[in-house]
Each structure stands twice: as structure tokens, then as C-alpha cells.
């Protein structure tokens, strides 16, 4: 009888069958462990990520590390900002989230997430779920229908993985040197985040793609196929040249045309600046030694003005040392020797601003918590405190019962004004809360409103919060920062400016900026009241205006508002000037350039009207809107434009370029909810093409022409837009949190040659509203430098892209404020 064999007892060698069984069991166990590890590495950390939402942006390091250290485990510290869906903003009735988590918790989470980064999936543009990094196709299909908690966790995980991966950040800032397939080149990374906070990324490193293939399980073939299609469709310029056209991106991603446009416009931008190639080359050489520093620490400004601090208008030390304030010198700009590099605090309880047009009627009190103006001007219907709102029931002293009636009354008095046709660009001096300019939008007219920062507390700040263009400025000792002969109409409604004194120096400044044939609309008390002081002012003004050859067109009284309006017209020829009995005011010297206005003292003289029919000002511009698209008649083909072409051709090419960029890229490709954008600034406008391309949106654009750039501001006005001269080495004359979007096209690389770039970015932060957008187009080195600075402020990088030493950066400002404080002694009073 055969005996059973017991290996342990008999101490005999096990059979080969038993050995095979054990091997299979061990192998299966290892496979299961491996699958479990892969699954946990992709999903597990998402539970921790929830702790690092918008509510805890304080929990992020303040110091940026230089690129050389990134490969050694150091990383850019950036909060995964999950902004509320902008489509649901409405009146902005929800406060912006608070920040209250510690930095130690954030650091621990970042260390864990960094270990898992390499196993992250490369997103596809074919389905939204794959783009968000899901691993299970069944779960992905749920995500397409709205998703749930798992979707948010995976999305937050991807946000952090992209930002924490040192290799990814290095690639993000490297320019591509060859125009090859993106998957082969491995030098570019494009990041995108839609307005609901969902970030997508396109990693063009082929090695990463190969690693992903090895690690993926159930959806390997699908991911690989869609990744390849995404790369070929959305990135490589050669695809467009070969005639391929695919529409595989999801609703949140920009369509293929927009992504291709991001490349095309960058290439076009390089070519368009060929006339400045030498200057750019010298600048880039000078930048090499300064572009590597990425240690940025921010502090909070401690000033008397607090959340309303304007550096060049709140220089208490300089104002106290003024020898005189007779000419409103204390209301003029007095910039500190070293511009501040600290950040302005937010007012307590700051909320997302109410959207236009509701903002014209009411704003949040907590955003502009000032009541003195309501108390001082409440009886004149300027502004009232209504619960948690500040409301604007009438508009101004001269139109208590509404601005629109007043606006229509002016045109009824002088039909030639023709709002929105002949008259398009208006200057409103002493604007108050700018209701006049705010309601002129209804007549297709844009208004540059100005008022000083004076005892009428925060009047310009009210205007900007309402979504109405305005600047802090005063008629003092220097010229206004505008070219000569650009405004169609100048308006003054009880603006309290002593026009008639000192030879009419202030009124002569209006004469400088007013077009020949333009109107001066004056509705101050001397026009219709008979008090002794008013009668004397009216007499002096009448004599001065007659000597200036202005024609009194109309004097009418509005019975509803109870005010009178006098309208004058500037002459279009020099005949009257030549026939005056005495040359007072005198004619300006031929050497006096009427367009020179940056810190130029006022002169009590008049500039003659242009007699040459080819000169600007000799003819009235085309009626609006034809003037927007047509090159001004005085641009000659013999003139060389900014970009090297004949001036009219340069103008047209610039307009076509920006229409293409805005339509194909900015409107759809950057994840911006334009319904929430109202106040826009082009920090380096050339011909105003960017602003012109935004014409159909409910926005207005402040076109800034830097003082060291070609003087093209008159062209901007000629096409029915407006703007201002400015030196970006100084602060802008506006209140903090004034703009929803800033656009900087090849500005910062030029500025850092003569300015402190850190101070410039601090000014950008001051001017931009929380959740506001910054779009930067510049060389790749400058893009990297700016990105490092804004990341140190915990801003959210929506997209960054670089190719052939040119880059594009789109970021969103956060509500983060530093805990460290810097006291500005010159601003303490």
C-alpha cells in the first residue's frame, strides 16, 4: 500500500508542481499589491487636498526657490485656488472666502503629493473626465454629467500635482527652440484652468507619456490614443499648415482654433516687433544676470490711507514739505523716491463687486466703506447708504433727477453734439461720482472722468467700483496727461474750477485738449444764478472766452433739474486769433508741443489750429463707429509705423492681429468669464487694437501709453477710444482694486531695464481686484520672473505657455494678504 508523503515530516524536496503553484500565488499577490499601490497613489491624497482649498491659502510658504534648486526636491509653493463658478456670481452677494489654515499642514500635504506626481495621467481633450485625471471610465462618464465629490478630489489632486512637480515647472519656463511635434520636443507645457477651478494641463514630454503607458491599467489604449490626438490637434503649428482640423476638446477647454492661435499670435508678435529688434536684444542681454532670482517675500503696507493707499497721492512727507498749496499742489502727484514693494490691505468684509449694469445703481458698502460723501452730498442725490449697499439715486448736483434727462437736454439744446455719432470721447472735469459718464454709455459715448482726491471722500473710488472709468487728477500746475486736440467734448458741471484766474491758465488747458470744432459744456452756478459771486465769475469768463475765440452756441435752462447749461464751440481756424485787438491770451511758441504733457508745467497760451489739411485736427474724425476701424486720415504711407510697415498698413495689421487674438484665444482659450469683467486696462497700448477688439463686450478699456514708448495715444483717441500717458516706474493715479483685468503686452521686459520690477508687480496687485485677471505676453525669461512673483502672492496660474523665447501667462489674483507688515514712514500722517 502506497504511503502518503509529507514534505515537512519526511524532510524531502517538494515536487515541481507544488513549486509552480507557490510561484503563481506569489506573482498574483505581487500584482494585486502593485494594482493597489497604483490606485491609492492616484486617489488617496485627494482626501488631504480638500484641506487646502481657497479657505486656507495662508498655509503656503512665502519664499520662492531658484530654478537650480528645483531638481533637488525644492518646489514653487502655490495654493490650489478653487474659485467659485463665475457664471453664478450675479450681484456678488457672497463674500470672498477667508484664509485661516497653517503653513505646516500645507507643507506636509505637499510632501505627500510630490511622491505621487509621476503617476499622474496625461489629460486628453476628447472627454472632460479624462482631462480631469480620472482612472475609471465609468466614473469618468459620471463626471461628464456633472460629477460629484470624487471629481472635486481628483481635480484638486491634479492642481497640486502640476504645481508641485519640479520637472513640470522647469519645462513650463523653458522656451522651445525647434518647431517640432510637441510630443517629440518635450520643452513646452500648457496649463489651463476654467472658471470653475478645474485645471487642465498638456504635458508635452514624450518620456512622461511613455511612463504613463507603463503605469496605466484599464484605460491604457484609450488614454494613449486621445493623448496623441490632443497633442496633434491642440499644440503643433504644423498641424494647421498641413490642413488638419479636429474638434475634440471639451467644453471647458479652448477649441483647437484658439490653441493654434496662441502659437500663431506669438509668432506674429515676434515678427511685428522687428523694428525694435536691436533694442530687445540689448535688453535681453542685460536681463541674463537678473532673471534667476526667484526669492520673493511680500509684506503688507502700513500707511495712514490703509486699504485706499495711492502711493503718489498719499506721500504725506512730500505734501507737508510743499512751499504752497495755492494751486492745488497738495492734490497733485508726489511719488516716493523708491516705489513701494508691499501689498495694500483689503477692507474688512470685502466682497466680489456687483456686476455691470447693476453696479451703476448700487455697490457694496464694505468694498468702499465711506459715508462722509453720503452725509455731505446726500441731499443732492449723489450717494446714499441703503442697508449693506451704497446707492446712487440721481447722479450729481446738476442732475438730481437722473443723468439721462440731463444728457438728452444737452443734445436738445445743441443738436450738433449728436451723442454716439459725432461726439464719442468726452472729458468730464470734477466728475463727482461720475454718473454723467456712467449714463453716457447708454448713448454709445465713453467718458474720461477725473476728480481730485480731496474732501469729497472717495468719489473716484465710487465711480470705479460702479464700473465707470475715472482717474484721480486735478487741474493744478501741470498739464493733464493727454495729448492735444483729442476730446470731442469737455464737460464741467459745477466742477468748482476757477477757470478765469491767472490769465485763464486752467481754461487754456482745456483748450489744449479739446478738438478744433469741439464743445465745452458748462453747467456751473454762474451760468444761471444771480448771486454776486456768480455774476462776477460769469462776467470774467465771458471776457476770457471771447478772447479765446470760443463761440457761445447756446444757453438753456433745464426746468426739471433747475440748472442752466452754456455750450461753447472751439474754432476750427486761426482767423479769429489773427483779428484780435490784443494778443491775450498769447499764442504759444512754435516750439511748444501741444502733445507734450507728462509733468509739463501749464502755460497761459493757446495753440493755433492746424492749417495743413493733412494734419491731425484739421478735419473731424469719421462718425462713430466707422472711426474705430478706419486708419486716421493724417496717417501717411510715407510714415513708418511702430511695427515697421507703412503707418496705415501698420494700423490695419495691428487691428486684425488683435481681433484674431481676442476672438480665437482670449475669449475662449483662457477660461475667463467675461461677463464678470468690466474695468479693463491695456498697460502698453500701441494703436488701441486690443481695446477695439473688445468693442462688442460690456467693458471699457483704459489704454495706457508708457512715456518711453512711441507716442500713439492720439491715434487711440482718433478711433473713438481713450487713454492716458503714464510712467510705470511710478504708481498709477487710481485707487486700489480698480480693475477687473490688466493686459501687459511686452511691457515688463522693457520696464525692468529702468524700474524695480518687484515694485511694478506690487502696483499690479494694488490696481487689480481680488479674483481679477492678468494677461502677460513677453519673453520667456520675463514670464518666468513674473510667474514667480505672482505665485509668491498665492495667485492662481490659469495658463502659461512659451515657445521660441516668447511666452504667454494668464493668472488670477487671490485674496491672500501677507502677515508681515512694512511701515512706509513717508505715508504716515
Curated annotation (Swiss-Prot):
Annotated glycan sites: 215, 247, 264, 270, 302, 579, 595, 756
Membrane topology term: Single-pass type II membrane protein
Keyword Cytoplasm: no
Annotated GO MF terms: methyltransferase activity
Biased composition (Polar residues): 241-252
Entry GO terms, CC: endosome; Golgi apparatus; Golgi medial cisterna; Golgi membrane; plastid; trans-Golgi network
Primary location: Golgi
CDD domains in UniProt: AdoMet_MTases
Highest taxon of source: Eukaryota
Residue ranges that the Swiss-Prot or TrEMBL entry lists as coiled coil: none
Record keywords, A-Z: Glycoprotein, Golgi apparatus, Membrane, Methyltransferase, Signal-anchor, Transferase, Transmembrane, Transmembrane helix
Compartment list: Golgi apparatus membrane
Transmembrane segments: 18-38
Region annotated Disordered, chain positions: 55-258, 271-291
InterPro entries: Put_SAM_MeTrfase, SAM-dependent_MTases_sf
Enzyme Commission number, as recorded: 2.1.1.-
Cytoplasmic face of the membrane: 1-17
GO biological process assignments: methylation
Transferase keyword on record: yes
Topology, Lumenal side: 39-829
Family designation: Belongs to the methyltransferase superfamily.
Listed name of the protein: Probable methyltransferase PMT26
Organism listed in the record: Arabidopsis thaliana (Mouse-ear cress)
